[in-house]
Swiss-Prot record:
<keyword id="KW-0822">Tryptophan biosynthesis</keyword>
<comment type="similarity">
    <text>Belongs to the TrpB family.</text>
</comment>
<dbReference type="InterPro" id="IPR006653">
    <property type="entry name" value="Trp_synth_b_CS"/>
</dbReference>
<dbReference type="InterPro" id="IPR023026">
    <property type="entry name" value="Trp_synth_beta/beta-like"/>
</dbReference>
<dbReference type="InterPro" id="IPR036052">
    <property type="entry name" value="TrpB-like_PALP_sf"/>
</dbReference>
<keyword id="KW-0456">Lyase</keyword>
<comment type="pathway">
    <text>Amino-acid biosynthesis; L-tryptophan biosynthesis; L-tryptophan from chorismate: step 5/5.</text>
</comment>
<keyword id="KW-0663">Pyridoxal phosphate</keyword>
<dbReference type="InterPro" id="IPR006654">
    <property type="entry name" value="Trp_synth_beta"/>
</dbReference>
<comment type="subunit">
    <text>Tetramer of two alpha and two beta chains.</text>
</comment>
<keyword id="KW-0057">Aromatic amino acid biosynthesis</keyword>
<dbReference type="Pfam" id="PF00291">
    <property type="entry name" value="PALP"/>
</dbReference>
<dbReference type="GO" id="GO:0004834">
    <property type="term" value="F:tryptophan synthase activity"/>
</dbReference>
<comment type="function">
    <text>The beta subunit is responsible for the synthesis of L-tryptophan from indole and L-serine.</text>
</comment>
<dbReference type="InterPro" id="IPR001926">
    <property type="entry name" value="TrpB-like_PALP"/>
</dbReference>
<protein>
    <recommendedName>
        <fullName>Tryptophan synthase beta chain</fullName>
        <ecNumber>4.2.1.20</ecNumber>
    </recommendedName>
</protein>
<feature type="modified residue" description="N6-(pyridoxal phosphate)lysine">
    <location>
        <position position="99"/>
    </location>
</feature>
Length: 406
């Protein structure tokens, strides 16, 4: 495939058809098109409405707890002996991850559209918890679809969702993980078009979702620019974030895409190793195809069927990636790496011991690559890692893996 030309700006997408180059778009059943077009119109209006933006910013401040700190990880920086490492502390948000940034925007949009019933898919449960939280706050009905396998490995989050009044539907079809939960949510949406809003948790799905979720998450990168200028007097030299669908990464990256001197690294889940076949690294080990309403890189078998994704982290075992990431990969603006389960566990352990911060397994993938990147950089190199979630939800799983029953 010929490499696409480098654009004048990396921040103008998607086009009017919802495409980032050849990626993205709207591959949905005709029955869903009215929903999608209604959502696109409503989002365009809300985006241009200062009252909507003002309400969202007020909740981000007083309910979510933004801005999240930009924290110099002094001991970890000294340990690696290279770059000066900063954590963007998204794990300090209400509900414990970056997910709430996007959910707040979508729930306010659902209220504006007069939709009283909210559906969502979730993998690790963080998006489900954030959705259930905001539905409780605004008195909306909430139904969360979750793969039966993930229900088992994320019990604390399942209980949280139920405490918050959500109905959690375990999905028994397919691999019983995130992909299947998303399929079920889309089926629900088709059958309940009039009163239901589908709150997607990542930068995937049919247009306008990838752009809308990115816009709501871009608060991460906008704050990081301001905070780094205030603390160091200049912009960072590099950015690192983990990628499942890729919303935490897109939120950090997007405001910096046109600062071409800044190196940007996305870290996929390599599972047991990309060559093992047991991984979730769509860009490293996949090829372009269509899933969940958009064209992007996907894990596929020889017959073109969607392959099973594996990761130690329930939040990263999605067999695709957001279409904007697929495009950024092809135009060469972002470098995509991958971290194995074992590298991730070591980073999880090291961050806990060195900084007194127990990260979620998802951002521990990013930290695993920081361990390789940071030592190769000079001491004045400013590296920002998106610490996208806290590790509370992963403690039972990690304890079991390490043979230390809590």
């Amino acid at each position: 495939m010929n490499a696409p030309q480098t654009p004048n700006s990396f921040r103008t997408g998607p086009d009017e058809r919802g495409r980032f180059g050849i990626f993205g778009g709207r591959f949905v059943a005709e029955t869903l098109m009215p929903n999608i077009l209604e959502l696109e119109r409503a989002y365009a209006e809300a985006k241009a409405d200062p009252a909507f933006q003002g309400e969202m910013n007020a909740y981000l401040t007083h309910y979510v707890g933004r801005p999240s700190p930009l924290y110099f990880a002094e001991r970890l920086s000294a340990h690696f002996g290279g770059a000066k490492i900063y954590f963007k502390r998204e794990e300090l948000n209400h509900t414990g991850s970056h997910k709430v940034n996007n959910v707040l925007g979508q729930i306010l949009l659902a209220r504006r559209m007069g939709k009283p019933r909210i559906i969502a898919e979730t993998g690790a449960g963080q998006h489900g918890v954030a959705t259930a939280t905001l539905c409780a706050r605004f008195g909306l009905k909430c139904v969360v679809y979750m793969g039966a396998v993930d229900v088992e490995r994320q019990k604390p989050n399942v209980f949280r969702m139920k405490m918050l009044g959500a109905e959690v539907v375990p999905v028994q079809s397919g691999t019983r993980t995130l992909k299947d939960a998303m399929n079920e949510a889309l089926r629900d949406w088709v059958t309940n078009v009039a009163d239901t809003f589908y709150c997607i948790g990542t930068v995937a799905g049919p247009h306008p979702y990838p752009a809308m979720v990115r816009d709501f998450q871009s608060v991460i990168g906008r704050e990081t620019r301001e905070q780094m200028l205030a603390q160091e007097g200049r912009l960072p030299d590099s950015l690192v974030a983990c990628i499942g669908g890729g919303s935490n990464a897109m939120g950090l990256f997007h405001p910096f895409l046109d600062d071409r001197e800044i190196e940007i690294y996305g870290v996929e889940a390599a599972g047991h190793g990309v060559s093992s076949g047991l991984h979730a690294a769509s860009l490293t080990g996949g090829k372009p195809g269509v899933l969940h309403g958009n064209r992007t890189y996907l894990l596929m078998n020889e017959d073109g069927q969607i392959a099973d994704a594996h990761s130690i982290s329930a939040g990263l075992d999605y067999p695709g990636i957001g279409p904007e990431h697929a495009w950024l990969h092809e135009v060469g603006r972002v470098t995509y790496l991958s971290a194995t389960d074992s590298e991730t566990l070591e980073a999880f352990r090291l961050c806990s011991l060195m900084e007194g911060i127990i990260p979620a397994l998802e951002p521990a993938h990013a930290l695993a690559k920081v361990a390789e990147l940071a030592p190769t950089k000079p001491r004045d190199h400013l590296m920002v890692v998106n610490l996208s979630g806290r590790g509370d939800k992963d403690i039972p799983q990690v304890a079991e893996i390490l043979g230390d029953a809590l």
